[in-house]
Amino acid sequence: MDKDTQATLHHRRLGRVDGMTAGGRLEDMVRLFRSLAQSKRPEYFIMIGGTSYGPEKIENLASELSIED
């Protein structure tokens, strides 16, 4: 996995089907996630190849791949 890996950002909504917010490079999706208000971040996750990554894992990936704000 690298910064150019294709990923999608999804919004989790109670009582509704999760909706895809955006798709593109992992680096761009992490930056979009980080631009969200801190209180909203728990509602979002990133999908890569059928695997979902929550807020904590997204931050770990950002550190591992040296993705800055």
Which residues are covered by each model-predicted region?
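Compositionally biased, intrinsically disordered low-complexity segments
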Residues: 20, 33, 49-51
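Short aromatic-glycine-(Arg/Gly/Cys) micro-motifs in beta-strand/loop hairpins
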Residues: 1-17
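Generic structural motif
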Residues: 12-14, 26, 51
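Short, mixed-charge low-complexity intrinsically disordered segments
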Residues: 39-69
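A short, exposed loop/beta-hairpin motif centered on an aromatic-Gly-Thr core
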Residues: 17-24
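A short, charged, amphipathic alpha-helix used as a generic interaction element across diverse proteins
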Residues: 24-39
